[in-house]
Amino acid sequence: MNAEDVKGFFASRESLDMEQYLVLDYYLESVGDIETALAHFCSEQSTAQWKRVGVDEDFRLVHAAKVIDYEVIEELEQLSYPVKHSETGKIHACRVTIAHPHCNFGPKIPNLLTAVCGEGTYFTPGVPVVKLMDIHFPDTYLADFEGPKFGIEGLRDILNAHGRPIFFGVVKPNIGLSPGEFAEIAYQSWLGGLDIAKDDEMLADVTWSSIEERAAHLGKARRKAEAETGEPKIYLANITDEVDSLMEKHDVAVRNGANALLINALPVGLSAVRMLSNYTQVPLIGHFPFIASFSRMEKYGIHSKVMTKLQRLAGLDAVIMPGFGDRMMTPEEEVLENVIECTKPMGRIKPCLPVPGGSDSALTLQTVYEKVGNVDFGFVPGRGVFGHPMGPKAGAKSIRQAWEAIEQGISIETWAETHPELQAMVDQSLLKKQD
């Protein structure tokens, strides 16, 4: 690529109609001349060849991705990760902002991903290390997406749960219970105060617990709990399956008693999520399998907040994500970035509920609340409710009691002195520390 060719892949924001472009933030490591590498990077993900032989034309004017800003962070002695490559020369770590014309792929998530994190992005000469850090959508692009059907306020209205977090619980044992056993445990947790009892992301439609039978048992238990507590409840059924079975699984689950649906968004694909969101009349909630496999490395892959943003765009009403606990191996800053992506302004797209989770209990609720900074989040313990020494009803009560302490401005330990379910969690924690 000669010097004039390179210039065709650079532009200023002021020279472009930015409503016609997505803005992409990348971290990358280039080998050799930086601007030549960046020009190749833009070319490979858009106009790899921009004219026909012997024809006076240039498709870059409309269709080329263009560098609108870049910063050289530092020169490196070697790449951050060993990647086989043919180029030689100095290695530079860079932050790069690219404007990519969305006319190249339209309002279609599979085509968008093919362009901005596909072959052209990760197989560019001179750019062996790449991480997509963020995507910014213009309102003209967002106008073609429906986004969440219910969102945060819709979920709150269904549950009549305002001014506090929404309390989920992952029914445990997560694998192995019969539908009847599963329903009894969920029922007890609803009596104790959970808003939502959910299937584990690994429990879907299996021979020993079909979605039809499980939804029927849970629907009956849910209605009984609602009658006894006077509170609306949700059974969140996992319908993750082959794409050609999703609509059938949706209908079976809802018809038999599920009033919200769980979907493992990346394993089934965001296009499938969008299809379900457009079809369903109940809340659709996503889980995070598969995402860490390409987001965890600091300088390669795709930042997890990009996937959260795309899940919201595809129509999820809530996004379950790795939370603050040490087991989740996610920096606090990254968790908060994902939480913010659920609720920040996004054109006409409604906010979705962030649900950061992992090894939570009544004893971590205050920490999560303080870190999130408001009540617009879901709190999703598993063993923190269903492994409670006094049983799942007491486990759910301990969550509600912890929230009461927070509302009253009283320490968990002090509030626990007059609330035995919460005290049991405090005592259990002390025993673990002694071990």
UniProtKB/Swiss-Prot annotation:
Gene Ontology MF annotations: identical protein binding; magnesium ion binding
Modified residues annotated as N6-carboxylysine in this record: K198
GO biological process, one term: carbon fixation
Gene3D superfamilies: Ribulose bisphosphate carboxylase, large subunit, C-terminal domain (3.20.20.110), RuBisCO large subunit, N-terminal domain (3.30.70.150)
Record note on quaternary structure: Homodimer.
Function: May be involved in sulfur metabolism and oxidative stress response. Does not show RuBisCO activity.
Name the record gives this protein: Ribulose bisphosphate carboxylase-like protein
Protein's organism: Chlorobaculum tepidum (strain ATCC 49652 / DSM 12025 / NBRC 103806 / TLS) (Chlorobium tepidum)
